[in-house]
Amino acid sequence: MLGWNVAIPEVDIGDDIFVVQDDNGTLRRVQVKTSTSTLRKDGFSAQFNVSVKNLRNISNILVHYIFLVRHNDEWSNPIIIRQDYLLDHFENNNVGSESKGNIIFYFSYTNSNVECSGQDFKTYIKNFTDFPKIKH
């Protein structure tokens, strides 16, 4: 992934993968969420479940959530958002709805825009800010 080394954790604590920048030891925790699209009049939508417990479990190494949608036999551009930003959207902007220990995030895609619960998430499309490309 952009020159980072990827590792799968031995113990399931809610992370799908760890990515490491070898030259300085930078570690990122990543949770990948996938969904299939539902066609809409002006685009498509997708729904994702995130554990409330995991989202609220803020540690010194934040989780980066990557949301991907399978639409027309292709993967959408990834929505990449840090745990603290997603939690802030949930707690302060009414993004997502809580149900049975999970938060359900409903994304709607139109042209090059993405919204979640009416909030603009366009800034998170392919947001590799915390994953700069590494030249070897």
For every predicted segment, state its role.
Residues M1-I13, V19-H136:
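Mixed-charge (Asp/Glu-Lys/Arg
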